[in-house]
Amino acid sequence: ERSSNGFIDRILFVMPNLQQKARWNDKELPENIEQEWNAIIEKLIQQECSLNKFGEIEPHVLLFTEEAKRRLYEWQHHFSELCDQETNDTIVSIYCKLEIYIIRFCLIIQLARWTCEECDKTHIDLLTVERAIKLTEYFKDSALSVQSILNENALTSQQQTIVNLLPPSFTTA
């Protein structure tokens, strides 16, 4: 019921992958990290956009380099095999959404790298695709963990039948 309408498939879950309990330590983030992050976001936001004669934003298309495209296709073919073998419709739906998200991740990562002066913004390169794959795999694993938790709490069909037979109000005494 909770995932039958497809809404939950659209959520990117963040689940810590802690194999061991976290250890306390004295490591601190640099004091200027927040300012650096704000500067990156501000530079992205301040980008000039070309407008067409109707005042609408003119899209700027970033194509993939050949090696980046090859790697992305390789990942998608492997991901499709996982999808073909999956019997749970909810999981299949999650996989299909992630195939769309990975393209968006590529664009976000490439522009973030450009903002940090690591690359240009004329195309999406292999390093960006590799990072987008890692991010997508993380979100896949998190979604599978969430589905596992939801399924643990789901009633079996026999349990649901019994619950449905109960009167609207009753006591356990």
Residue locations for each model-derived region?
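Phosphate-handling catalytic cores of nucleic-acid transaction enzymes
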Residues: 1-173
